[in-house]
């Protein structure tokens, strides 16, 4: 047990994920990974490694009584650990019926929206700046490897092969260096120790964590990878999780370096301020102009600058499409913008190029400007 706790502390310290000044909201489903996260975070709070810890559970109401039992289990877990508890009810099926969206996509969006709202209220209650707050998720080595294979199958950019980030804004994944099997063993050993200072909860059937039966349905992409592909890969390499995670960390380190270079390059090749209104405050959503110098960059750097530019315009949660990045780089040839080039890309953004550069802006702004011209 000490090894798991020590490994998590090492990850938090080395990656500078959080400290005693950071209140932490845990996203807890009741499964083995998030249940272990709750126990570990409770210990880290007691040791002064983290600020005040609270639990959040989002009930999607997709599995009837089982979903309600999950919520009751997590609430009991919070009570036993003497930690604040947030419960959010979401009608995912109702939203899917109204919008036609995928259930998993709605569930993910609602979970993170609920976490953002709960973290804001938690920090306000503690009189702590929101920027200090952290949201801990229970993603493990297993999740990271599964994401790697999923992206390998459907395709991704070079940075996508780093898989999950240890931190993305307030969202932190402190268990990415720990396997699911290790976490389950940690819970079992904690239960066997029967230590009143380190309590363990059971559900109504005596289980140490909740199992979601739908996780075994291999018609779902992640479950297919988890139950079909990863076990086959482990036959060839029993140390698959450690091996692939080391490789992903190497990719991540190089990706970070290239991001720094791209950020520096953006200051030279991206103009966010309208030259007719030089004193106007920058609003990313207004778009920008990629200056002619952009066309002289190596194509991989063009792609990265275009990607980061679109992230700013579309918002940090947007999944930037490869086709949008390609449409931008296609607006340059022979080291300069292609005059007369136009396009319509993700987010209903308009592309238009002349010798001054390639403009990226909302389609409504583009049309208004064209009328004035």
Regions found by a protein language model. Name each.
Residues 1-228:
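Core alpha/beta nucleotide-donor-binding catalytic domains of modification enzymes
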Residues 4-32, 49, 54, 90, ...:
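AMP-forming adenylation/ATP pyrophosphatase catalytic core
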Residues 68, 97, 223, 238-241, ...:
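Non-catalytic, surface-exposed connector residues within folded enzymatic/regulatory domains
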Residues 75, 115-116, 230, 252, ...:
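Structural signal for well-ordered, non-membrane alpha-helices
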Residues 109, 177, 223, 238, ...:
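Electropositive phosphate-/nucleotide-binding environments in soluble metabolic enzymes
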Residues 170-173, 227, 231, 246, ...:
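Positions in alpha-helical segments
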Residues 190-249, 253-256, 260, 274, ...:
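Mid-to-C-terminal catalytic subdomains of enzymes
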